[in-house]
Amino acid sequence: MKKLIAATLAFAMILPMAACKPKVEPGDANRYKTYANMTPEQIVAQLTLEQKAAQMVQPAIYKTSNDDMRENGYGSVLSTAGHTNAEEWRKIVDGFQQASLESPSGIPFIYGQDDVHGVNYCVNAVYFPHNIGIGAANDEELTYKMGQITADEAKLCHMMWNFSPVVAQSVDPRWGRTYESYGSDLEIIKKLSTAYTKGLIDKGLVACAKHFFADGNVVYGTGEQGATPMLIDRGDAKLSESEINELLKVYQAQIDAGVQTIMISHSSLNGVKMHENKEYIMKLKNEMGFKGFIVSDWGSVENITGASYKEKVIKSVNAGIDMLMETDRFEEARQIIIDAVKNKEISEERVNDAVARIIKVKKDAGLFDDPMLANMKTEQTETGSLEYRKVAEQLVEKSLVLLKNDKNTLPFKQGTKVYITGSAANDGSVQCGGWTLDWNRATTSEIQGVTTIQEAFERYAKDYGIEVITDAKEASKADVVLLCVGEQAYAEWNGDTEDLSLTGALGLADNRDAMNAAEKLGKPIVTCIVAGRHIIINEDDYKKWDSVVMCYLPGSEGKGISDVLCGCADFSGKLPSPWYGSIDQIGTDKCFLKKGYGLSYGDGFTARKEPETVLDSASKAAAHPSDGTNYTKGLFKDGVYVNSYSGITAKIPGECKQAPESELSENRDYHISKCTNAKDKARESATFYDASFTESMGGFDFKFVNTKLAAPDDPAYDENKYLDEYGTFVKGLYKGFPITVEYKGRDKAVLGGKEYVRDTFTLSGNEGTQTICIYARKLDDNLMSVVEIYWFGKKTAEDYEKLFG
């Protein structure tokens, strides 16, 4: 279903392009050695117009292949390959690099990635607190170390270009990217972002200050209104000249620190889209001394003014953008640049300057001396080292802001029995927030290398001298309740909201239930808020809490929280922005708590010995929903999928590709992550994929549901009950997308001689309509067989059902 959603939105799936094209013969892979002794300008003089235009575009990894790189020699590739460890990342990047060296130009490429709080697309890397927490910590030295560690772990993945830091000034917490900002204080933003950038650069990485500029100053209600309407993200910043100059000082500090690239903002400034704002883009180069290159943001060229895509590409290049992050339309953009130069709509001097800047950055990064990074040096040999985790742990400790501590409930004293409750206590995805293993959020709550708050308390309870209780039935035995509430994980406009309350659309589903249950216990309550911004706190709830700690999005090291709450370190974090008491206060001088507020344990506090950090287990294996059943794994051979247990035999169309096992697990995790109630979570946790086959316009999913786990209290749970629940769940998956979901009805259908109950849906968007058929058949007391078929076009369900024999 995760891929189904992607197909519906984009009408394109991850397809191996090489399967559609003849193999490209490699050229001389050693030309980079000659280039190494030439200036960027001399190298540019050797290139054809076509080769120069290729350096100016940046495809997404899932839209290109090694053969495409070998044929065209693109300047860069970006985005994620999924849940991938450092070793696999190296293979991926090295494959593209070898192909780039064998391309007609022979220019090394550079891989770009949004490593915004550590190398967050790498499994078992260190995930630091997001920037809002770094702003609360306000520790220049540790932020510099964070940059160094991020660079070192990125190099272990051979990802040499980091789209970070975000240097936005966040002024409205309704903005979904608030947590990516260091706060609202420009001096703190300038100090910390510069320290971080220096850390990246000093360890050999290419940094990228973003998003130029005023992306955090946009006015609520002016959000971009494209295929997905946004409330505030990518909106319009209405600023005076003096306000603009203050924001530019942050970028001047980045340039002075040596930042090599700058990314343009999706947003507008006083009504002008930044991607076409030549005045300010060229100001970077002509007045502020920027010698690196300018990159556009994801697909943003399409959203500027212009009668055609051609006009928009030409306008953005002429405005001063050197590399176009046109992830899907990169080939079209490349050809437009070529034709525009020939037609004198873009000067060749403009192209030469852009490519020289791109090559300079690559040369300075050492890619012309050692493109395969064979001689690259790193401090660590693997990601996620204990040494690096300790630095992240320190930042977590310093980022915590104590809002309230009535009766000195904190720190927990030795002998205290602590009952831990609330969804934020034991969910790695919530704790790490967006941009973790995936763009919007990690699709699983159990993330390798992440120690949750609850796990930290349990792991070090003996060291702290406390007893941890997690069973609600035993809660009455506790002396104090540790209530962990917060927000769902989100990224960009998905976090835009007009309701900042803990029980609003982006609050965790059980926040209210957990708060009510904690109150009923009649014990002192310590509340930890795990969120990417200052949410609006209900006044009555706040009064009932004895202590309140703002944790922001702490990342992988939950021990930083348990250490401080158990008295191994004091609170030192301060609010990096005002904390508003209501929506009406936003943008005014009124607030609940002022910027810079933060309590400590006070005079006389003596820190206890901190327990030695223990690395998280390499994996967190959970019971599989097939355990205890007679399930057998299906087989796929010679284009035919067979599962003897369900009795299904299906001829899979040749254009469909079988998904790897890792993707099947990811799809299941994705569904579980989207559950907002206990019934959905039980059902999706009881569901597992046997096989999945996809092509660009549709596919087949074969699943099983353990009905005893899905509905343990309902022995009569059948196909109709499943489809009723699952159909409602499917509709919810598309909420917020520009898609209309229509239920077409339920009937019976035969798959391979077996009768199934079939539900049919259509999903309609700007590009057309997709049909989804969901088939269910109960096999025995334990398992139900579920088949999903989805497609675009005029075919009928019966056309696909004929493939089953």
Roles of regions detected by a PLM:
Residues 20-621, 626:
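Glycoside hydrolase catalytic-domain context in secreted enzymes
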Residues 9, 13, 17, 402-405:
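Hydrophobic core
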Residues 664-775, 784:
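Conserved polar/disulfide-associated segments of primarily extracytoplasmic proteins
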Residues 1-4, 8-9:
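Positively charged n-region of N-terminal signal peptides that target proteins for export
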Residues 618-683, 736-743, 767-769, 788-805:
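N-terminal targeting sequences that direct proteins away from the cytosol to non-cytosolic compartments
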Residues 83, 115, 531, 654-656, ...:
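A mature extracytoplasmic/lumenal domain signature
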Residues 779:
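Extended hydrophobic
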